[in-house]
Structures are given as C-alpha cells and as structure tokens.
C-alpha cells in the first residue's frame, strides 16, 4: 500500500534521512520507533511532501508521490495526526471535526461524523466546547477524530502518546487497534516503544536517519538490543 524505497531527505545541507526503505501493507499497523532526533517525524513529513525527498521513491497504492505538492498528496485518502495534536484551539469540537471533513462527500459527511462520535463518546459530550479548554487526552482524541473525518485508508500518527497520562495512552492505543479492525491501515511513529511494539504487526527502528532493524513487533519487543536502547533493559 505504502512504500519508501531508499529515500533520502535534507534540511539545507544537512542530511536527515539516509536511504530509508519502509513498507506498509494494507490492513497492517506498522510502527517506526527511535530516539528524539532520529528522523521519525521527518519521514512522515517527507511522505506528505514537505520537505520533498532528495532521492528515492515513495509510492502509495502504486502511485509515485515524490514531486507532488502536499495539497495533492493529502487528497489521496491519507490523513495525518501531527505531533502535539495541533487542534484549532478557538474552534469547538464540532468545528474541528468539520475542518477534517471539509473535502468529504456530502453524503458521507454525517455518516463519518456519527462514526467518530461513536468511537469517541467524550467528543460527543464536549461537542460545543472549545478545543483549547480540553485536556491533552481529549485533544488527542479530537485530533484523531478530525483525521478520520476524511475517510482515510491510511492513517499516519506522529507520537500520539506524547505528554499523556498512562491510562489515556492505553485508551488511545486501544482505539488504534479498533481502527485497524475496521479496515484502516496505520503507520505509527512513536517514542513509547513498549506500547507501539505490542500493537504493531511489523516495526522498524530508526537511528540517525537510518533504518537499523526491521522485524515483527513481537520479535523486536524481545530483542535485547531494542530492550536496552528503548525499553529500559
């Protein structure tokens, strides 16, 4: 469904990604783990077209994405939940969700809204509340709900557990698993390696802009090198 083939990305003269190859198959949850500054978010941003890959290929459902503007890429049934949530703080929950569904067909809009509110009952309770007055966990639910309003086939999640309480993190990961059961393919970028690897079908480890390991989530969870580096031994 999605493949990166020897992708390299630069910020000016600084190379952030070095010949990165990653594959996400339809119906999978694939996670990318790594330390701060490893290049995880850069890989997602490169997929979205900003920055553009300097070399290599990124294909989604057989179509080459490198060279396309971000506005075109994001109309291809791909949705992103950015790091830090980035909800529209002065808009209500309803208005935030409406922004996510801006390009959704009129016939599908209310169906999708109902699905999101069923998935996140808390958003239904806070429907008329301004997003900026909500807790971090509620804002993360809203950010995911907003992304789902576009009816994506592929959902990109950038550090969804960042800054959240453990009980909320567990809820978020349960929702990600539920989305997979409903047919959404998930590419998860996450520092919380323990949770991410438990959830993932397959996983990649990124260090200094390079893929250094790739295996099933279960295998990496028990890998001594991964445990020492990312799971506290």
Curated annotation (Swiss-Prot):
Biological process, per Gene Ontology: D-alanine transmembrane transport; L-alanine transport; L-amino acid transport
Principal location listed in the UniProt entry: membrane
Annotated residues for binding of ATP: 34-41
Topology class, membrane: Peripheral membrane protein
ABC transporter domain location: 2-233
Compartment(s): Cell inner membrane
Keyword Cell membrane: yes
GO molecular function, one term: ATP hydrolysis activity
SUPFAM superfamilies with a match to the protein in the record: P-loop containing nucleoside triphosphate hydrolases
One Pfam family recorded for the sequence: ABC_tran
Cross-referenced InterPro entries: AAA+_ATPase, ABC_branched_ATPase_LivF/BraG, ABC_transporter-like_ATP-bd, ABC_transporter-like_CS, BCAA_Transport_ATP-bd_LivF, P-loop_NTPase
Keyword annotations of the record: Amino-acid transport, ATP-binding, Cell inner membrane, Cell membrane, Membrane, Nucleotide-binding, Transport
Cellular component per GO, a single term: plasma membrane
Annotated function: Component of the high affinity leucine, isoleucine, valine, transport system (LIV-I), which is operative without Na(+) and is specific for alanine and threonine, in addition to branched-chain amino acids.
Assigned protein family: Belongs to the ABC transporter superfamily.
UniProt name for this protein: High-affinity branched-chain amino acid transport ATP-binding protein BraG
Source species taxonomy: Bacteria, Pseudomonadati, Pseudomonadota, Gammaproteobacteria, Pseudomonadales
């Amino acid at each position: 469904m999605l493949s990166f083939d020897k992708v390299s990305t630069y910020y000016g003269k600084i190379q952030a990604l070095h010949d990165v190859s990653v594959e996400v198959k339809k119906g999978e949850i694939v996670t990318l783990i790594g330390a701060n500054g490893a290049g995880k978010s850069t890989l997602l941003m490169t997929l979205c077209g900003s920055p553009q890959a300097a070399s290599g290929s990124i294909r989604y459902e057989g179509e080459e994405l490198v060279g396309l503007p971000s506005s075109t890429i994001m109309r291809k049934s791909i949705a992103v939940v950015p790091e830090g949530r980035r909800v529209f703080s002065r808009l209500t929950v309803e208005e935030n969700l409406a922004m996510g569904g801006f390009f959704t067909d009129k016939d599908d809009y209310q169906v999708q809204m109902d699905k999101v509110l069923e998935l996140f009952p808390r958003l239904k309770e806070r429907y008329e509340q301004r997003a900026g007055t909500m807790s971090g966990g509620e804002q993360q639910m809203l950010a995911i709900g907003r992304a789902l309003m576009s009816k994506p086939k592929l959902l990109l999640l950038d550090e969804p557990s960042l800054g959240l309480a453990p009980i909320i993190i567990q809820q978020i990961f349960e929702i990600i698993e539920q989305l997979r059961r409903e047919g959404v393919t998930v590419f998860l970028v996450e520092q919380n390696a323990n949770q991410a690897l438990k959830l993932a079908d397959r996983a990649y480890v990124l260090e200094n802009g390079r893929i250094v390991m790739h295996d099933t989530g279960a295998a990496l969870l028990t890998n001594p090198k991964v445990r020492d580096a990312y799971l506290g031994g």
